[in-house]
Each structure stands twice: as C-alpha cells, then as structure tokens.
C-alpha cells in the first residue's frame, strides 16, 4: 500500500501547524486537523497525480491543497515524499 514520508522540514512544518492550532483552537481541534492532514496525505500517496505540477519550485515537484495549507511533494517508489507543508498565504519560493 502506498504511503507518505515527511522530510525533516515537513515534520517541522507539521509540528508548527499543530502547535499553532492548539494555541488558537485547542487540543481537540488540533487532533482533528492532524487527522485531516494524515488522511489527505494517505489519499495523495495512493493517487499522487492529483497534485498540480510545480516544476517552478523544483524538478518533479507537485502541490496539493489541504484546508488552509499546501503540500509540496514528489512521487516516490512507495507513494510520495512530502517536502513542505506551507500555509496558503506563504510564498513557496521563499521556503525552498
């Protein structure tokens, strides 16, 4: 079954997203949002071509929106490798 792998930067992004959600909305909502992101990444690993081609970011890059965030990834042999998870208001060119 295809899966996803987070790079260290993507792990840091996810940690910051969850921490910010806890601060703003509480632990229960953070858990819901973490589960939403996990489910979306698992689905994206199964159907990696759902994402938009983003060779402007780096060769082989794709992006896909999840709620208020954009996942940047590339297709791997086992699913997807997630490079970053950025808020939709962030300029991706400043984070790669």
Question: Where are the regions that the model predicts?
Answer:
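Basic/aromatic recognition patch in beta-strand/loop cores that engages polyanionic ligands
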Residues: 49-78
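Short proline/glycine- and basic residue-enriched helix-capping loop/turn segments at helix->loop/beta transitions
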Residues: 42-46
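Enriched for short, Lys/Arg-rich terminal
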Residues: 69-70, 74-96
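Conserved beta-strand segments that form the floor/walls of ligand-binding pockets within enzyme
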Residues: 5, 65, 81
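Arg/Lys-rich, positively charged N-terminal/basic patches that mediate binding to nucleic acids
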Residues: 1-34
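Short, hydrophobic secondary-structure boundary micro-motifs
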Residues: 30, 52-54, 94
């Amino acid at each position: 079954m295809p899966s996803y792998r987070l790079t260290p930067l993507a792990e840091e992004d996810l940690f910051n997203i969850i921490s910010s959600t806890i601060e703003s909305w509480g632990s229960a909502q953070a858990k819901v949002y973490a589960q939403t992101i996990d489910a979306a990444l698992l689905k994206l690993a199964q159907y990696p071509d759902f994402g938009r081609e983003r060779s402007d970011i780096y060769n082989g890059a794709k992006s896909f929106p999840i709620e208020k965030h954009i996942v940047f990834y590339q297709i791997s042999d086992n699913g997807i490798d997630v490079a970053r998870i950025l808020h939709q208001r962030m300029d991706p060119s400043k984070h790669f």
